[in-house]
Regions:
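Charged alpha-helical initiation segments
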Residues: 1-69
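Short, contiguous, well-structured surface segments enriched in hydrophobic/aromatic residues
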Residues: 35-50, 80-89, 120-131
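Amphipathic alpha-helices that form helix-helix packing interfaces
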Residues: 44, 48-51, 55, 76-80, ...
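Short, flexible helix-adjacent loops and helix caps
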Residues: 53-60, 88, 92, 174-178
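Short, hydrophobic, well-ordered secondary-structure elements
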Residues: 66-92
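Charge-enriched, short contiguous segments at helix-coil
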Residues: 141, 145-218
């Protein structure tokens, strides 16, 4: 880490070049926004290298190291989600709708027995198919069910568990006094995340050369 100091006069540490990450990432034919995906992939992989260097080399408090684990997992899951999203869109398997909300009508409150009720009616018009939101759980299920990637089925189950940790990006979500970040992220989660990410990035559908991801095995 000393080489990263602005006062350092020696050779600086640099992550793997952006161009190498871009060139190494394979995407399915028909993937939309390939340039943006490759760019964001490269930037976030560089960031993971930097986070991993901090975790490996810095002497930090238990709170700070825990927060680095959290950041690493959030970024890594984001990379996987982007690749799964791109794959489903390329394969024309992304969730679509042919209806668009036109208007909503609401009634006034009415008495019904001992309750106060109101009705709300949504009116839709039929349109050409368009993409709608698809959550990460749905992406994982679709990728697995269709067998789009050369991955063991156990990878998907493990990924779902890690996905729950990614949801802790929402700081207000908790289930009790002890349900906080410090109690939810640890070195095992971090190691687990690296292994899963390595498996996904080196599968033949995404990878030209697995050697570039060797740092994930450290």
């Amino acid at each position: 880490m000393e080489t990263l100091l602005k006062t350092s006069t020696g050779e600086h540490w640099y992550p793997t070049a952006v161009s190498r990450y871009k060139d190494n990432l394979k995407l399915f034919w028909g993937t939309p926004n390939k340039n943006q995906i490759r760019s964001n992939f490269a930037y976030n992989m560089q960031y993971l290298e930097y986070l991993q260097k901090q975790i490996s080399e810095l002497r930090l408090s238990s709170v700070l190291i825990t927060m680095l684990y959290k950041t690493y997992i959030i970024v890594a899951i984001g990379i996987i989600e982007m690749l799964f999203s791109a794959t489903l869109k390329a394969k024309k398997l992304w969730k679509t709708s042919t209806y668009e909300l036109l208007l909503t009508t609401k009634s006034n409150l009415q008495n019904y027995e001992d309750k106060r009720l109101k009705t709300e009616v949504n009116i839709y018009k039929q349109v050409e198919p368009y993409l709608i939101d698809m959550d990460f759980d749905s992406m994982i299920k679709k990728i697995e069910d269709k067998g789009l990637l050369s991955l063991e089925h156990s990878i998907y189950a493990k990924l779902k568990k890690l996905k729950k940790l990614r949801n802790r990006v929402h700081l207000q979500v908790c289930k009790g006094d002890y349900d906080h970040d410090y109690n939810n992220f640890n070195s095992d989660d971090y190691s687990y995340m690296k292994k899963i990410l390595y498996k996904i990035l080196t599968c033949p559908e995404f990878c030209n050369n697995a050697e570039i991801y060797n740092f994930l095995e450290n």
